[in-house]
């Protein structure tokens, strides 16, 4: 009878040993949500702008240094694969309210928060006599990978 009681206790405690093992190996990676992505973007933009609120960015295709003002984060922001998250934004050219850049940001976890790991100009402002300013895309996404439309690619 005592032996049976010991066997029952061992089997009863067996599932708990798995929990101890999981804790020893580290917790599962944190899942980040819309609010987390937007908060990370707000922190990044706030930390990056200068004293006048200007966001400076080197255009990875033209090499031009851009001086921009943040307008908005587009919905939806999302997780694109594994631990990579994505946000698309609009920035206005200083002194030209209708002239907008669409800037994309890739974020990854660093500890318990997301940080920006890559930034690209997705759409650049172009002017049309009929329509005024519009955003001309440089690339599209195929299976969440960047594919340049016109053969443009970033400069080293």
Residue map of PLM features:
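Short, cysteine-centered beta-strand-loop-beta hairpins and adjacent loop/turn segments enriched
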Residues: 78-81, 92-104
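A short, surface-exposed beta-strand/turn
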Residues: 97-123
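Basic/polar N-terminal segments that are highly enriched at the extreme N-terminus
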Residues: 21-28, 152-156
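N-terminal secretory signal peptides that target proteins for export/translocation
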Residues: 1-6
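Bacterial N-terminal signal peptides
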Residues: 9-20
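N-terminal secretory signal peptides
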Residues: 24-84
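C-terminal partner/receptor-binding element of secreted or periplasmic proteins
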Residues: 114-156
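A short beta-strand signature
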Residues: 87-91
């Amino acid at each position: 009878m005592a032996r049976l009681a010991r066997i029952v206790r061992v089997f009863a405690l067996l599932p708990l040993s798995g929990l101890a093992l999981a804790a020893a190996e580290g917790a599962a990676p944190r899942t980040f949500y819309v609010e987390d992505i937007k908060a990370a973007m707000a922190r990044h933009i706030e930390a990056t702008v200068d004293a006048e609120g200007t966001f400076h960015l080197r255009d990875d295709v033209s090499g031009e240094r851009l001086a921009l003002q943040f307008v908005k984060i587009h919905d939806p922001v999302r997780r694109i694969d594994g631990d990579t998250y994505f946000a698309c934004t609009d920035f206005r050219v200083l002194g030209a309210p209708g002239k907008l850049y669409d800037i994309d940001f890739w974020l990854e976890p660093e500890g318990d928060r997301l940080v920006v790991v890559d930034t690209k100009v997705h759409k650049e402002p172009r002017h049309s006599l009929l329509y005024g300013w519009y955003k001309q895309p440089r690339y599209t996404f195929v299976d969440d990978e960047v594919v340049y439309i016109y053969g443009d690619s970033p400069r080293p």
